[in-house]
Amino acid sequence: VGKSGKVGTSVATVSALAPDAPVAVAIYWYRRYLEQGGHARNTIESYCYDLALFEGQTRPKAIEALKARDIAHFLGESETRSTRKRRLTSLSGFFKYLVGAAKVLSVDPSENFYPDPIALKTPRPLFAAEQERLLAAAAADSARAHAALWLMLRLGLSRGELLTLRTDHIDLADPQAPVVYIYYDNPRWKGKERHLAASAEFATIYERLLDEYAPDGLLFPILPQSVNKIVERVVEAAGLGRDDITPQTLRDSYAVDQARAGADEDRLIAVLGLADDPRNRLSVGRYLKLGAPPL
């Protein structure tokens, strides 16, 4: 098996998946499973790269012969905590597939391993006055900049969500209470979909965007790097004196404002479109701490 996780042979000669199958064969079928499940290409390549390294280290063992010590040895060669965590994620998914979906193993040799915790950085949200200066500078810059920054700062959209937003995702039936719908093409991310209440202010901003750019389909047909450049340009024009403001900073600021307004952990998970898992619970805990009343 190559480092991409692809078996160097034709599909017709790949044997069926069974307990005595080589690791390389199991990786081939796992890759097929991920592809059919609609996983992102980069995710599949990352998983299979780690699994190919694991296969090279454990060859010629069959999957039924793999033990916890094989997992420990592979993880122990990780040079950083982030590499160890990524490798464990790759192995965990692989063995969950073999035990659960494929049902060729009865025991997961990786189940008693846990990732080393990687501390989450405390965000530096924008204060209310900074937010107003930023939006004023965005309005002076362009209709596109104004709409983009407003959506990230006032509704907490991520950069990726901003770039997939379309004209038919904006409901202006009531201009005093517009609704912005966040959709995902990949079925795996349906849980992140949501609809967010905007304001009459956004209706005005949106109408200006339509007038100046007449978008056909995508509201922001630009590259991710272009969003970063817009934010950098507007931050400089606003004279905030900070060089650490990114699209994520705007989303963080929204989340902290929501926490100040009374949002709890469940509410933050929902409005931010996050998966309900322990890591994200820890993440929104940072917003709750920053949004709590001062001591």
Q: Where are the regions that the model predicts?
A:
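N-terminal DNA-binding module of tyrosine recombinases/phage integrases
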Residues: 1-36
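Alpha-helix N-cap/helix-start motif at helix boundaries, enriched for small hydrophobics
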Residues: 44, 91, 148-149, 156, ...
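Conserved tyrosine-mediated DNA breakage-rejoining catalytic core shared by Y-recombinases
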Residues: 164-204
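Active-site/catalytic core of tyrosine-dependent DNA strand-transfer enzymes
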Residues: 197-242, 254
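Short, basic (Lys/Arg/His-rich) helix/loop patches that form interaction surfaces
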Residues: 214-216, 232-270, 274-277, 289, ...
